[in-house]
Amino acid sequence: MRKKIVAGNWKMNLNKSEADILYNDLESKTYPDDVEVIIAPASIYLDSFNNASKVSISSQDVSANNNGAFTGEFSAEMLSSINLRFAIVGHSERRTFHKETDLSLIHI
């Protein structure tokens, strides 16, 4: 049986101390075995929360590019190198503000 996923995208909210409080609260909870809880904190906090035992960590985005002059973007290889298993792809805000399309997302 596949696990149910409960995910929360923190977007560009919470300073580090606020994020720590929420993260620690989520880590202190008990979750059913058939549920995977995933959080997508701001990118600046990804590595600091990536030692979670009960909560999985996701990037809020992943670049279609493997490397190059793409300031502020993260490749799948970079995210994988810090053991991230999840990334949000095709979010409505990325589509609206960055003009991402189904076609551009196929390359990710």
State the predicted function of each range.
Residues 75-76, 80, 96-99:
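Extended, folded domain segments that form the structural surfaces/walls around functional sites
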Residues 1-74, 81-84:
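Conserved N-terminal beta1-alpha1 strand-loop-helix module at the mouth
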Residues 13-15, 92-93, 97:
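Short, glycine-rich nucleotide/cofactor-binding loops
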Residues 106-108:
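Conserved small/polar residues in nucleotide/adenosyl-binding loops
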